Structures are given as structure tokens and as C-alpha cells.
């Protein structure tokens, strides 16, 4: 009787193992950095999260009280306008502790040409693919595969970032 039960279990395990689907090469899904951006967006420019894979993405972490962050906004808008049509996307991630309460009026007032996301508690505590954000602004450049290709602490200069974006867009 035990042998029969063991044989049935083995057959069941083998049958179920054969039902498992195997992903095709290159379809492992978005990178952990892109998955970390699955956050609520506020303001007039929503994030179409499904359009991020395959694009070069500039992720800038900021806070509404951070003066260098605010000073960097025109540079980010210019980069989006200049490179957006070629497959580039700027994404602003707000680390304000009051979240939507502060970021929604901010995003509506500035009417930026790129999405503004509201960070969640795990991200604020450094538990995301981006790790702990040590200072603001903090900017990451992701390649078309969603991997970090560049990073800047503090204000990023337009020409430096633009050159890095152009290089990734050509790949």
C-alpha cells in the first residue's frame, strides 16, 4: 500500500512539474529598479509604468523642501523635452514624509512634463533596489534594460547628463 501511495505522489509531482511554464529568453520581466518605480503618481503627467521597459530612464529623488532639487527642475524638464521623443523618460520620486499631501499640490503647481511619484515607506527607509538615498537630489540613469548606467549626488549638470543619455539612446 505504501509503495502505491509513493508511486502516486511521484507521478503527481512529475506531472505538476511538467505543467510549469518556462519564460522565454529575455522575458524575465522588468529590472528591480523599474519595479521599484511602481508607485502612485501625482500631478498632470501620470506615469505609464508599462512603457518604461526598453526606454532610458532618469530617476531623480527629491523633496519639496530641498532647494537644490527645485533648482534642478528646469534641467530635468529640458532633458525630457530634448530626449523624450527618442525613448527617454524622466521620473521624479518625492521623498517628502507627508507624501501625497505635499507632492500633489507641488506637482499640480509646477505642471512638469514628466511624472512625479510618491515614495512609499520601504523606499524612504532604503528598502528598494535604489537602496538608501544619502542626499538630495540623487539621480540614477537607467539603461534600456533597466540597469543603473550612471548616478549623480547633488545637482546634475545638463551637459553631463545629456551626453550620458545620448550614449545610452544610441545603444
Q: What residue ranges belong to the model's regions?
A:
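Structural microenvironment flanking redox-active thiols in thiol-disulfide oxidoreductases
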Residues: 71-110, 121-127
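Active-site acidic short loop of glycosyltransferases
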Residues: 53-55, 85, 112-113
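Short, thiol/selenol-centered motifs that function as redox-active sites or metal-ligating centers
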Residues: 66-70
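Short pre-active-site segment immediately N-terminal to redox-active cysteine/selenocysteine motifs
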Residues: 55-57, 61-65, 135
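Thiol/disulfide oxidoreductase modules built on the thioredoxin-like
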Residues: 110-112, 120-166
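N-terminal targeting signals for export/organelle localization
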Residues: 1-38, 150-151, 171
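A short beta-strand-turn-helix
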Residues: 36-57
